[in-house]
UniProtKB/Swiss-Prot annotation:
Coiled coil: none
Stretches of the chain found on the membrane's Cytoplasmic side: 1-67, 629-664
Organism: Caenorhabditis elegans
Localization (cell): Membrane
Family, as annotated: Belongs to the amiloride-sensitive sodium channel (TC 1.A.6) family.
Cellular component GO terms held in the UniProt record: plasma membrane
Keyword terms, alphabetized: Glycoprotein, Ion channel, Ion transport, Membrane, Sodium, Sodium channel, Sodium transport, Transmembrane, Transmembrane helix, Transport
Extracellular membrane side: 89-607
Glycosylated residues in this chain: 241, 300, 394, 508, 562
InterPro entries: Deg-1, ENaC, ENaC_CS
Name of the molecule in the record: Degenerin del-1
Amino acid sequence: MARKYIDILKKSKMMLFQDVGKSFEDDSPCKEEAPKTQIQHSVRDFCEQTTFHGVNMIFTTSLYWVRFLWVVVSLVCICLCMYSFSHVKDKYDRKEKIVNVELVFESAPFPAITVCNLNPFKNHLARSVPEISETLDAFHQAVVYSNDATMDELSGRGRRSLNDGPSFKYLQYEPVYSDCSCVPGRQECIAQTSAPRTLENACICNYDRHDGSAWPCYSAQTWEKSICPECNDIGFCNVPNTTGSGNIPCYCQLEMGYCVFQPESRVRRIWEFQGNKIPEKGSPLRKEYMEQLTQLGYGNMTDQVAITTQAKEKMILKMSGLHPQRRAALGYGKSELIKMCSFNGQQCNIDTEFKLHIDPSFGNCYTFNANPEKKLASSRAGPSYGLRLMMFVNSSDYLPTTEATGVRIAIHGKEECPFPDTFGYSAPTGVISSFGISLRNINRLPQPYGNCLQKDNPQSRSIYKGYKYEPEGCFRSCYQYRIIAKCGCADPRYPKPWKRSAWCDSTNTTTLNCLTTEGAKLSTKENQKHCKCIQPCQQDQYTTTYSAAKWPSGSIQTSCDNHSKDCNSYLREHAAMIEIYYEQMSYEILRESESYSWFNLMADMGGQAGLFLGASIMSVIEFLFFAVRTLGIACKPRRWRQKTELLRAEELNDAEKGVSTNNN
């Protein structure tokens, strides 16, 4: 009995352990399903609970035909949503922008004002420069011919190389051919500007380049070519067989013991550069006249506007080749040009408030308010509170190439380089010219919304050092670099990028041809693309309105120094009155902004997702949690599984020990 009782007790103990172990396996947190089963359960739970309404309806319905219907509807909505997404993305990729206009009611800072005389150099001083004198003489010859040219001659004229032209040594005196009126019984003759029938009937005169006089004159037959022992700096030579050790070609009138330096090319004809008529048709001098005109660069030109334009370009090039101090001495001084000045109702200090700016086209210009550190502003709108100037241009000393009398004005920012030839306004004499200005501050967007240069990214290749970036300065810099690369020298009209660069010789015809050719190439749209000159991101733009009235009036009391008898008429001919002022005490700020930002993109995409899928940002977060959970199940390490099994075994052992203890 006892033995039987012990067997029954052992059997009960074993059954109790199995029941406890089974209960532990059912309730233990360490029990783990297969990863595949866990993923299936995770997907099922997500689909049944998700806020993506189409997915939810597919997995919660029990009818197959309803489930199929929801699948079709969901696919159609997904396609429509993706199509809508593509349109929204295209709109964002276009990087469209809008311009916001803000009107600021306060006094705007006054701009810098650069004023110039339309005539760049004084005529009497410019003619003392041999290069300019030659250019003006050639211009005179071209204008005279244009008044008397015939189409038959023009069609038969071909352009010759400028290398065949004259090459003079620049001295004050030179021999010239002239038609003469000789007094019987005297050797000397009187020079005339008309053309003789032949050179044999002409005289040779000693021509003074400085004052344009031709004296003395002797018959050409009494002059002979010779070799002189010495010539001085102004062109006179010692007669042969006298003091000196040189062998210099010269022209001599031996009867008078008179010799002058012989030019390297042909002797000039006075009727070509001072005469008012060309040689008669059929004369041998007429053909020579036209050949000379072609060599000077005016071949096949009869339009005086075109002739004047070309003469201006030649003169600008030759003047630009002079030393800046010498060039400035040929122009107008500050006190000569600006006679009276007031700003904001107060008298200006002309000596200190105007800064010299030498422009290649207009010579000496003067800039008011050029100091960036000094801020000037008008206290009120209107002419009385702006800049008022009386300028004296002295039109009696104008160059023959200057077509109008008056002044040139450029309105620009204080940190910008003035370009009066490109962005200037002309004001005539005898008129009070009023320029009403308005400021517009422009703020552009950089990449990817626009293409502009930011302020903190200056152009290192700009030749205008110390000035703010401008597209015009960029184009001129690009042109200068191209000229240096192609012609081997720098255009004298613009600054040099490097000190080691040499200026182009304006008297060298090969160099001039290179400047003309390369300048024409750069003017094409295709070549301008290589310059990559873009607008600045921040820019002050001044708009101008112009009005004028006759000046001075008959009742005004004016002083004209030595011309007090008819002062008003004198001022109308030689002076101009200028007014530059703000039209209103406000200015505009134009600011570009994003038309369609990243926030707009997200909002529109969310709206489309909600419309077609019933989804929101919460749905996206929900899906991300599901994806992370599923990925974690699929990528669970094997070591973690082994550790879980070990923990489960330990728990079973602990449970067995617990049962044993309870039985005891």
